[in-house]
């Protein structure tokens, strides 16, 4: 019986090996692309019309005016169309799979690219396509997508895509809308410097590692529940942010320089693993919509001309706090009460409004005596200036303040230690402001 089993197993291995050899050898040599081959005319592409599968990296360039790759269903390698400055259109509508990357780059008069059957590709790069108006595909699987410096008005070629590693869309000045059914983003979702009326819709997205939005007009993330790393909104024309299902942000949460922003709605958000930064949003008079936020793992930094800050459920800030309003109507009472109870655990606590300031230096002894503090409080009647975070000021402040944050799994952040005597008069930049640099640099 054992002998029969051994013979059967050996026969199966031999059959599998022969099948693999047969499969490999079934691809004719004419369908194998040499390492330095470049197609510069349609006749070069026609040579592959009898191939179901191409093996190698296909590069297209030169003086080709219109191009078509007919009948090929699979490329075991990459497809690159580069610097074909006379090319106006390209089609490969039989192509279903590219094991490596699809690259369309520096095609100055290309108006359309059609890959109607393409379902699987490792990465897509559409870069410097100033005349393109349409890109067609049926992508269901892609790890990385980069779309930069094109004239696309909408991104419609990814309507079947459910998961992605990187989705980066930047510097597409005519872009007005992006709507995607993506459900998970394992690395980063980034939109920046596109058309100033761009609308972003990712209503099926449930989880993302990192999201960064810059120069966006409106956003919709109806089902987003968790951000493993950071979430940032920098310099947008958004009027409201509604993320009612979001409950956890693993690291930094930044809302900076959104002049038209008036409303926040993060009613289910309970934990921020890193810092919370809300700064220089000139239209945001009342900062609310954070009703269930209980824990901030880093520092709390809020700067602007707001009249109220509602953080009623907040129990713990593991870093320091720097809250400064230009409005004389803003009250520091709630934050001072939280600090006195030991809820703000960092070395510094600064709260200012247009009429007064409260600054506290915590003694080193306090950290070893169950959060008992020795505090020196100074008050001033001079008017507070709204901080303007220029790159020069931020970098200078950053050298005086450092913030460490653990990985996405632990999601913790500690405030800077060292010479942190925060007894700054109103209008003087405190070292904690340096935190904003690290935040902006980390998400851009």
Swiss-Prot record:
Give the coiled coil ranges.
none
Gene3D superfamilies under this entry? Answer: Receptor L-domain
What is the protein's given name? Cell wall mannoprotein PST1
Family per UniProt? Answer: Belongs to the SPS2 family.
Look up and give the membrane topology term: Lipid-anchor; GPI-anchor
Q: Which domain of life is it from?
A: Eukaryota
Species the sequence originates in? Saccharomyces cerevisiae (strain ATCC 204508 / S288c)
Q: Which UniProt keywords apply?
A: Cell membrane, Cell wall, Glycoprotein, GPI-anchor, Lipoprotein, Membrane, Secreted, Signal
Q: Which InterPro entries match?
A: CWI-Assembly_Regulator, Rcpt_L-dom_sf
């Amino acid at each position: 019986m054992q002998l029969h089993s051994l013979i059967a197993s050996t026969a199966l291995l031999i059959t599998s090996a022969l099948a693999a050899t047969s499969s490999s050898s079934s691809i004719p040599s004419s369908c194998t692309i040499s390492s330095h081959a470049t197609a510069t005319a349609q006749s070069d592409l026609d040579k592959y019309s009898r191939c179901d599968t191409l093996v190698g990296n296909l590069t297209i360039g030169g003086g080709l005016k219109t191009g078509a790759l007919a009948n090929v269903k699979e490329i075991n390698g990459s497809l690159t169309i580069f610097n074909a400055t006379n090319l106006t259109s390209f089609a490969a509508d039989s192509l279903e799979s590219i094991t490596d990357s699809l690259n369309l780059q520096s095609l100055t008069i290309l108006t359309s690219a059609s890959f109607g059957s393409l379902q699987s590709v490792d990465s897509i790069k559409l870069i410097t396509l100033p005349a393109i108006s349409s890109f067609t595909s049926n992508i269901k699987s892609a790890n990385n997508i980069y779309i930069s410096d094109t004239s696309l008005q909408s991104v419609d070629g990814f309507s079947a895509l459910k998961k992605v590693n990187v989705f980066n869309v930047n510097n597409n000045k005519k872009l007005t809308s992006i709507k995607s059914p993506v459900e998970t983003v394992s690395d980063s979702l980034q939109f920046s410097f596109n058309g100033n009326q761009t609308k972003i819709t990712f209503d099926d997205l449930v989880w993302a590692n990192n999201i960064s939005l810059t120069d966006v007009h409106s956003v919709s993330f109806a089902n987003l529940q968790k951000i493993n790393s950071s979430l940032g909104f920098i310099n947008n024309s958004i009027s409201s942010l509604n993320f009612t299902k979001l409950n956890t942000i693993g690291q930094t949460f930044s809302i900076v320089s959104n002049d038209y922003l008036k409303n926040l709605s993060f009613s289910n958000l309970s934990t921020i693993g890193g810092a919370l930064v809300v700064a220089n949003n000139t239209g945001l008079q009342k900062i609310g919509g954070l009703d269930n936020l209980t824990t901030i793992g880093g520092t709390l930094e809020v700067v602007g001309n707001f009249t109220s800050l509602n953080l009623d459920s907040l129990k713990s800030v593991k870093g320091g706090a720097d809250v400064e309003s230009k409005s004389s109507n803003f009250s520091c009472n709630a934050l001072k009460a939280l600090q006195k109870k030991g809820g703000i655990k960092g070395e510094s606590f600064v709260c200012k409004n247009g009429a007064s300031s409260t600054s506290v230096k915590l003694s080193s002894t306090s950290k070893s005596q169950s959060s008992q503090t020795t505090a020196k409080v100074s008050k001033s009647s001079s008017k507070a200036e709204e901080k303007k975070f220029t790159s020069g000021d931020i970098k200078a402040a950053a050298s005086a303040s450092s913030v460490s944050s653990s990985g996405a799994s632990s999601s913790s952040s500690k405030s800077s230690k060292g010479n942190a005597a925060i007894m700054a008069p109103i209008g003087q930049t405190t070292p904690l402001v340096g935190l904003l640099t690290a935040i902006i640099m980390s998400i851009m």
